[in-house]
Structures are given as structure tokens and as C-alpha cells.
Amino acid sequence: SESIIDDVIRSVTADCLLANRSSEEARRGLADYLEKNLIINEGLGIKARRRKIAALIGPTGVGKTTTLAKIAAQCVLEKGISAALITADTYRISAVEQLKTYSDILGLPIEIVYNAKELKDAIQKFRTKQLILIDTAGRSQYNRRQMQELKELLAVNPNIEKHLVISATTKEQDAK
């Protein structure tokens, strides 16, 4: 929020003025401040022999599909985790093709689902995978019908973790 940004600016500015630092030292000071004060999420927290199902949800255009592909790549290429992709984003032009391209590159199976029953079947199909990543269509929190559709879709399995993806420039009042 803006108050956090103000605190960072005050702290780093005061430190730089008191120490008469150069711009490079100021950058390092900012990096040190952020490192000490930011909480870094450890990701999806995938544990051995425990399956994880994660759905990325959020408004249109925030990068859910790209984020999903990056998570999949990191899990598969760096950690050797067995994974599968599911897309329920059949609304955006080329969304399915984009995810199919990622699945081809990573050698991952992919299913395209149009409703809750198909999602349930796809999750069952991938039951041996350690990680199942679900891409969803962009939804506005102000559109009750869209929110209800998303809720019904993800209700097929109580183990689906919902991860909200929003733009870094989203205003605090819009995120509520």
C-alpha cells in the first residue's frame, strides 16, 4: 500500500542523507531494506509423495497463463516434479494454444476443460502427478455470474488451492 511505500522512501532517504551516500550506495541500501523487510513466499510448497492441485485465478490480462507456465517450468526442470496442466480458459483467443505450446516445450500432458465434470475427470486422469496446475479464464470480481461459474468449477475438488494473480499495479481498493 501507499503507506508502506512512504515508509520505504523515508527510511532509505534518511539513511542516504545521513551517510551522504552515492546513488549506487543508495540502490544497495534500498535492496538491503527490501531484503530485511519483505516476506518472500516460498511458492506452492510441494512436498514429496503429496499431490498438489493449484488453480490460478484473477482478472483478465494479469498473466495467469504465463505465471502457470513459469511455475510448471521451475517445478519440472529444476525440481524434477511430475506435473500436468489443465486449462479452463476457453474464452480468450489463443489461450489454449499458448498453454499447449508450453506443455509441448516442457513435455507435460494437458487437458482442456469446458465444465466442472470435465475438470473433475481431468484431475482424476492426472491422479498420479505430483502437481496439477489449472489455468482459469479471467474473471471480474464485480461480475456475480462469472464468480459463481468459477466457484462451481473449482468446487469439484476440495483440495484445489486457489492462488490469486493480480497486477503489481493494482490499487489497494480494487484488490478488496
Could you tell me what each predicted segment is?
Residues 48, 126-127:
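A short, aliphatic-rich alpha-helical micro-motif
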Residues 2-62, 66-83, 87-90, 101-102, ...:
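Primarily NTPase-proximal linker/entry elements flanking Walker-type ATP/GTP-binding cores
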Residues 84, 96-98, 105, 114-125, ...:
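Conserved catalytic-core segment of NTP-binding enzymes
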